[in-house]
Every structure is written in structure tokens, then in C-alpha cells.
Amino acid sequence: MICTVYKSRRKLDTYLFVEKRDDFSSVPEALMTMFGPPQLVMLVPLSKRTSLAMADIEKVRSELKDKGYYLQLPPPKANLLEEHKLSLGIDKYAP
């Protein structure tokens, strides 16, 4: 299976995987509106890959099969202040 990967011009580090190039018929209209005009990034031969950089390849395959698309969102940003407080033993809910 070869899938097509597009990046969002509106949302940083957000990617949309679809089964066929320029076929967004299975992607909900609301998602396409938020995603904005898709910019082609690459074609990926999923059948020949064992992993992907930022996504679980089995989840990508499964969602492409079930929904016809896979949306890759950016990883959550680390809250360095909260991590530092935790390392010092400071409870973030303490008054």
C-alpha cells in the first residue's frame, strides 16, 4: 500500500495521510476546513516500511483501512516550569 502525505499550511507539524493522491473524499469537511489547503509532502510505501518517524505505522495502516485517512498531530509541548516544579517536589495544586 502506498499512501500520500500532506502537511497543513495552517497547523504547524500537522500531517494528513490519505490512500490516494488528491483524494480527500473520506476526510470530513470540517477537518479539511481546519487543515487548510493541503501541501503534498511525499508518497510512502507502507507495505515496505516497518516504522514511521512520528507515528505508529500499525495505527496509520489501520486508520487508512477503516477511515480512509490518518491525521498526525504534533506532539504536546513540554511544560518545562511544571517539570521543574515536580523535580523539586512542589505540588502544582498547592496554594
Swiss-Prot record:
Protein name in the entry: YcgL domain-containing protein Sden_1630
HAMAP family the record matches: UPF0745
Species annotation: Shewanella denitrificans (strain OS217 / ATCC BAA-1090 / DSM 15013)
Record's signal peptide: none
Source organism, top-level taxon: Bacteria
Domain YcgL: 1-85
Transmembrane portions of the chain: none
